[in-house]
């Protein structure tokens, strides 16, 4: 294979999956086949999409009810020749799912890239090992927290929040994805002030924290804004990838003048992936494609919290981010939303140690503030790695957190 194989979930009311698959393969490549003269068939053969797999799935009454008709469900795989498209994500997505995405009854499940095609994508600049080297933390999950309530607040408020989170033992603090360029906390001011705070905490407490700053603006201004952030001392760039496009992420990741890790936020991705019947699967969108395009971190809804993904989907995202691939470094999985210390054993059990535990309210909502919240998480992480049940840990910060949010991990065995 020199091109790409697309895997689709299809719903066919004609109940002929093979015919439907062939129609898609032709419609997204040469348009027709059987009515072409033999000579023209020979000329176009190398451009023709080829159906390589058709698998019928069990009938699903809920799907029939939603679509208001009886359909046959199936998984099909189609190979698209590399000759048909340039080796970039806009061309690949348009080839494999462009007009097909308008069907409303087809979901793009996966894309399998040939080795030849993979060579055109950067992958993460730092990856898991590179991030761990920056922090000098190699033996546990990382802990990340989020600035909360920053809109309408000034630099002084940001510095106080950042200091408390860092003292609490948080490894990475990220901007809220809805914090854009503004008069009260402009980009470079946030970075310079944040670096001063984090250096002070490091000198006093010996704990290193990185700050992920949200790089925003018009598309054609992004590179310049990212370079301004780097020049000001940015540790990590947070990026709302799906408000801009995967190719924009790749452009940032490939730029040698932007030599910092990139953290991909999933904002807007639900518009592509939320439906079980159509769109693009979350593992492909938030896992494989983000990694190929250059994300060092991928945030996605956890299976446990307030905006939960099904566990199978979340684990599939993580698999795509972390599986061995000679072409790409591994990206950090960041299962997010509604995370509190009681979920830590679940996260480590399901995602392993190479994960970023990301919390907002679970840190800021602690009765002892963000310092207490961070310490509660760090204690929960250490206890879990020692296979010690959280309710047996004698720690006031963790005990307070479990009283507020509960301890659903009481029966978890690692």
UniProtKB/Swiss-Prot annotation:
Pathway, per UniProt?
Amino-acid biosynthesis; L-methionine biosynthesis via salvage pathway; L-methionine from S-methyl-5-thio-alpha-D-ribose 1-phosphate: step 3/6
N6-carboxylysine is carried by which residues?
174
Q: Which PANTHER family match?
A: RIBULOSE BISPHOSPHATE CARBOXYLASE, RIBULOSE BISPHOSPHATE CARBOXYLASE LARGE CHAIN
Q: What cofactor is this protein dependent on? A: Mg(2+)
Q: Which Pfam families match?
A: RuBisCO_large, RuBisCO_large_N
Textual note on the cofactor: Binds 1 Mg(2+) ion per subunit.
Recorded protein name is 2,3-diketo-5-methylthiopentyl-1-phosphate enolase
- The protein's assembly and partners: Homodimer.
An additional note in the Swiss-Prot or TrEMBL entry is: Has no RuBP-carboxylation activity.
Keywords assigned by UniProt, alphabetized: Amino-acid biosynthesis, Isomerase, Magnesium, Metal-binding, Methionine biosynthesis
What's the superkingdom here? Bacteria
Q: Give the top-level enzyme category.
A: isomerase
Could you tell me what this protein does?
Catalyzes the enolization of 2,3-diketo-5-methylthiopentyl-1-phosphate (DK-MTP-1-P) into 2-hydroxy-3-keto-5-methylthiopentenyl-1-phosphate (HK-MTPenyl-1-P).
Parts of the chain that traverse the membrane: none
User: Can you tell me which residues bind Mg(2+)?
Assistant: 174, 176-177
Q: What is its EC number?
A: 5.3.2.5
Q: Gene name on record?
A: mtnW
């Amino acid at each position: 294979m020199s091109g790409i194989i697309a895997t689709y979930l299809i719903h066919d009311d004609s109940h002929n999956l093979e015919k439907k698959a062939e129609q898609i393969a032709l419609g997204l490549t040469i348009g027709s086949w059987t009515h072409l003269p033999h000579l023209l068939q020979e000329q176009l053969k190398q451009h023709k999409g080829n159906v390589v797999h058709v698998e019928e799935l069990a009938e699903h009454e809920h799907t029939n009810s939603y679509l208001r008709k009886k359909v046959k469900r199936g998984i099909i795989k189609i190979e698209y020749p590399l000759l048909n498209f340039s080796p970039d994500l806009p061309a690949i997505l348009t080839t494999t799912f462009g007009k097909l995405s308008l069907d409303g009854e087809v979901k793009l499940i996966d894309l399998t890239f040939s080795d030849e095609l993979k060579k055109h994508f950067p992958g993460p600049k730092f990856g898991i090992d590179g991030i761990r080297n920056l922090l000098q933390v190699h033996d546990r999950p990382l802990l990340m927290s989020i600035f909360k309530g920053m809109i309408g607040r000034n630099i002084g408020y940001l510095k106080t929040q950042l200091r408390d989170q860092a003292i609490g033992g948080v490894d990475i603090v990220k901007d809220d994805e809805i914090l854009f360029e503004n008069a009260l906390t402009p980009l470079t001011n946030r970075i310079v002030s944040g670096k001063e705070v984090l250096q002070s905490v490091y000198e006093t407490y010996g704990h290193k924290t990185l700050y992920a700053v949200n790089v925003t603006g018009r598309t054609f201004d992004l590179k310049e804004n990212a370079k301004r952030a780097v020049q000001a001392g940015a540790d990590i760039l947070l990026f709302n990838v799906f408000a801009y496009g995967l190719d924009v992420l790749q452009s940032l990741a490939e730029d040698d003048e932007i030599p910092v890790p990139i953290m991909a936020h999933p904002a807007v991705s639900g518009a592509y992936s939320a439906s079980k019947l159509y769109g693009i699967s979350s593992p492909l969108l938030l896992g494989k494609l983000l990694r190929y395009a250059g994300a060092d971190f991928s945030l996605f809804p956890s299976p446990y919290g307030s905006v939960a993904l099904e566990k199978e989907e979340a684990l599939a995202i993580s698999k795509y981010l972390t599986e061995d691939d000679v072409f790409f470094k591994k990206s950090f999985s960041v299962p997010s939303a509604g995370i509190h210390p009681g979920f830590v054993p679940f996260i480590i059990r399901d995602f392993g140690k190479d994960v970023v535990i990301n919390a907002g309210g679970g840190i800021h909502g602690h009765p002892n503030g963000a310092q207490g919240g961070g310490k509660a998480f760090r204690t929960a992480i250490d206890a879990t790695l020692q296979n010690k049940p959280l309710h047996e840990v004698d720690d006031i910060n963790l005990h307070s957190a479990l009283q507020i949010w509960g301890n659903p991990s009481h029966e978890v065995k690692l």
